[in-house]
């Protein structure tokens, strides 16, 4: 079984020790050090942002080469103690951003959450500030449906942001992430508790990916050359729908789940969410990270105790 990185709750001390092993005898990182300039991580106190910071440290990036931007920089104290710069920055307050990004060479622009406000406008504020601050390369966390030509709905904001970045004049990389699989643990636990899953041939099947794998992909792009002006589909290894979720949960928990036909007039969202535009799997993650993406089965195996607890 592949070792899913999402199960690792590694201490920062261990991350630094791992990073030290990557460092050359001269004290500089062989592929991820200061020579590439400082890396700005927006949304650094969020779930994805925090994982990216830990990945960067584990890859040997000195904390002093990190500029961590957040609306709540007080939550970044653990990284500040290691030497990272922590700064306030709010995409809705454009006046805060040039100072927040100052001194950076690369920017990981983590998209703000759906429903958190007008995303293209907020992202444009960040892009304009990045250009003004002299950022040379923007890495953006986009959405996989764009790769199949989807430019409306959930993909619309991301498509508009991608276009703004491409027009900015700086180098770019689009990380078109699929939907996080982490949330499937709760869904699977409910199936186990009920002993039943409602499925349909109309169910959408999605290349779910763990948040941890998305962080690994971002860190890989930020610390290695050759990713300029390229778009990557960051997905899990398999297309997954309710049927496959139930089968994986049953196998891991050792408890049967009956597959029952979904009602014809059941919620459209359970069958149509994402649609064909979300039916994407790719080897891009493996090319960037040097390992295969975590499967839903592996995710469930790592959270077996949680599955069993929720099934009671």
Name each region found by the language model.
Residues 21-29:
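C-terminal segment of classical bacterial N-terminal signal peptides
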Residues 8, 211, 242, 295-296:
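Structural motif detector for alpha-helix initiation sites
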Residues 253, 263-312:
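A hydrophobic C-terminal alpha-helical subdomain
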Residues 112-113, 304:
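Short glycine-/small-residue-rich Rossmann-like dinucleotide-binding loops
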Residues 35-70, 74, 92-95, 100-102, ...:
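Oxidoreductase cofactor-interface core, primarily capturing Rossmann-like NAD(P)-dependent enzymes
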Residues 6-15:
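N-terminal export leaders
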Residues 80-93:
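Rossmann-fold cofactor-recognition segment
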